[in-house]
């Protein structure tokens, strides 16, 4: 007969890893909009836009975003260890799988926007001509890449919502502790249509949600009754 019980030290180790990964991921999602230059807003095919794309801040900000997504996927895997053997076991697996698929679909767009636009902008500034910046629209707005990007972000949001449901049903974490992070990722697509301050505020929401969940994961494990 297979032993399906989960050793306390295994759950504690998973909780510590998940807390660290969620915490760092949340901070990276805050740095992403905070460091990003915004001179390209309403000026994406002008030299003002090129100055944003060519800056070190542009590259760093998008790298922060990409690392945030990777760490989010790893955090979901570690959270699954915490939920193993609870009523939310299968839901935790679903959250991990959906999140990773979403991350996989999202990252190619971030890579293109980061490195391709950076290279195009450096060349445009060197030539003193904005003509090359017509490529910005092609890099950003093609049907295939936009579909992958939007689908990826929707799946990441679905993964975060599924994780919140798993946490609610698990009995080992405070029921509400996954909801703020789920709300943050549900707002990931809409925040792109807001002004810079909205994007920075969204980063604050994501960081707060991730740190809240991290703090809950570091609390001593409780039984189902106490976790409510």
Regions found by a protein language model. Give the residues of each.
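Hydrophobic, aromatic-enriched alpha-helical segments typical of multi-pass transmembrane helices
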Residues: 2-228
